[in-house]
């Protein structure tokens, strides 16, 4: 793939030029306070390289899923503040995405300045299914950069989206990949292009339907496929076990039966489950055998015996990819499974495995549970994007840069 890189743009020279950077700054907030700044930190190397080279940087990003511009809880104001602190310079926030204020502020930028546009998803054209509407917003964003602008794609968490600020704008300006996207593609390729064996994949999360494509794509290629989290109950049901009130996708039972029959030597399911009476942090709970979940109880975490088995299967692996927690880690009583799996992967990494934490909830989980990023080979910033790449899908936001 012939994609131009940020290093190429810096070589061409950016002093005095407006550069639009699409970053992924979609950080978790609680009462307008950022609880995990990981994605902001991951975007800094690209922004800093541009400001230090004298570019006038305009950052486009989204936060959450706002219904309208009046949805002020999704304003990027806390992100502008966090960027200002981390860059040690004032980062202005435009009050709109591509309107009058954005233009005025973009025109007023000096070399090395940074402007953050308001949440691009405040503009319904960003995610429009109508190509012409997206193109229109993309043209307005490109216009912010004037006559000699450039576009840098550095939001790995959104490159699987065909959206105006990710895909369409890349066709309007000279386009480059930023340091983060370059690093993500390089690291994830170690799981897709001839990975070292034994290769183990751990999949958690709630729905089989969300991960079915990945499971089908990976099962023939991997040596071990560990399945936990909410989606394991549909697999347990497919084995003929009762699952009580646990999360269950009836429509996926036959798919799970087929997978279990074809890959019985590779698929590893929990042997014990921590069950609770209700989906609540303080609910009554106990550990039961995977085939012993009674009515009135729901599976909320992976049991200690299962985690021990998972660890044994991961021991000696050369490549490990993990996406999705294996329990309700947000509740302390049900975080042990996810923590235990993270410990097993960290241990395997210490012993020479190349490990990737595939973004999204898994990345938040390992950080919230106190693991240093260095405990793993790579923590991806993109949940959906990393899964689609692992599955072998084309990422529109990357493919569009290949010119």
From Swiss-Prot:
Instruction: Provide the top EC class.
Output: transferase
What are the EC numbers? 2.7.2.3
The listed locations are:
Cytoplasm
Record-listed substrate binding positions: 24-26, 39, 62-65, 121, 161
Could you give one GO CC term from the UniProt record?
cytosol
Record-listed ATP binding positions:
211, 299, 330, 359-362
Query: What's in the keyword line of the UniProt record?
Result: ATP-binding, Cytoplasm, Glycolysis, Kinase, Nucleotide-binding, Transferase
Reactions the enzyme catalyzes? (2R)-3-phosphoglycerate + ATP = (2R)-3-phospho-glyceroyl phosphate + ADP
The pathway this protein participates in, as annotated, is: Carbohydrate degradation; glycolysis; pyruvate from D-glyceraldehyde 3-phosphate: step 2/5
Q: Which PROSITE patterns match?
A: PGLYCERATE_KINASE
An MF annotation (GO) of this entry: phosphoglycerate kinase activity
Primary localization: cytoplasm
Name the protein family: Belongs to the phosphoglycerate kinase family.
Describe the protein's quaternary organization and the partners it interacts with: Monomer.
This protein's name: Phosphoglycerate kinase
Record the organism.
Corynebacterium kroppenstedtii (strain DSM 44385 / JCM 11950 / CIP 105744 / CCUG 35717)
State which gene encodes it: pgk
């Amino acid at each position: 793939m012939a994609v131009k890189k940020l290093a190429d743009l810096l070589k061409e020279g950016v002093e005095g030029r407006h550069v639009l950077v699409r970053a992924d700054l979609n950080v978790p907030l609680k009462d307008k306070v950022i609880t995990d700044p990981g994605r902001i930190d991951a975007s800094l190397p690209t922004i800093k390289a541009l400001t230090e080279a004298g570019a006038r940087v305009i950052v486009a990003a989204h936060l959450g899923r706002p219904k309208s511009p009046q949805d002020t809880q999704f304003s990027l104001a806390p992100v502008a503040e966090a960027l200002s602190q981390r860059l040690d310079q004032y980062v202005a926030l435009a009050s709109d995405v591509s309107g009058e204020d954005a233009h005025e502020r973009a025109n007023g930028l000096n070399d090395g300045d940074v402007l953050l546009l308001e949440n691009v998803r405040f503009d319904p054209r960003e995610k429009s299914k109508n190509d012409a509407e997206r193109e229109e917003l993309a043209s307005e964003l490109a216009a912010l950069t004037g006559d000699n602008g450039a576009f840098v794609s550095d939001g790995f968490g959104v490159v699987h989206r065909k959206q105006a600020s990710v895909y369409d704008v890349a066709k309007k300006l000279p386009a480059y990949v930023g340091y983060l996207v370059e690093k993500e593609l390089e690291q994830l390729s170690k799981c897709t292009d001839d990975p070292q064996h034994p290769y183990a994949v751990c999949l958690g999360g709630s729905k089989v339907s969300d991960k079915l494509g990945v499971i089908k794509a990976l099962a023939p290629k991997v040596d071990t496929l560990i399945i936990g989290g909410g989606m394991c109950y549909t697999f347990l049901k497919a084995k003929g076990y009762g699952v009580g009130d646990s999360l269950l996708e009836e429509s996926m039972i036959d798919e799970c039966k087929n997978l279990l029959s074809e890959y019985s030597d590779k698929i590893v399911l929990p042997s014990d489950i921590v069950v609770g009476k209700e989906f609540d942090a303080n609910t009554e709970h106990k550990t039961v055998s995977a085939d012993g979940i009674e009515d009135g109880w729901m599976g909320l975490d992976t049991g200690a015996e299962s985690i021990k088995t998972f660890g044994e299967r991961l021991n000696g692996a050369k490549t490990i990819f993990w996406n999705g927690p294996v329990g309700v880690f947000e509740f302390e009583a049900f975080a042990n499974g996810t923590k235990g799996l993270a410990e097993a992967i960290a241990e395997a990494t210490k012993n020479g495995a190349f490990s990737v934490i595939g973004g999204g909830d898994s990345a938040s989980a390992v950080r919230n549970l106190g693991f240093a990023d260095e405990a793993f080979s790579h923590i991806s910033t993109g949940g959906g994007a990393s899964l689609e790449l692992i599955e072998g899908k084309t990422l529109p936001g990357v493919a569009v840069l290949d010119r």
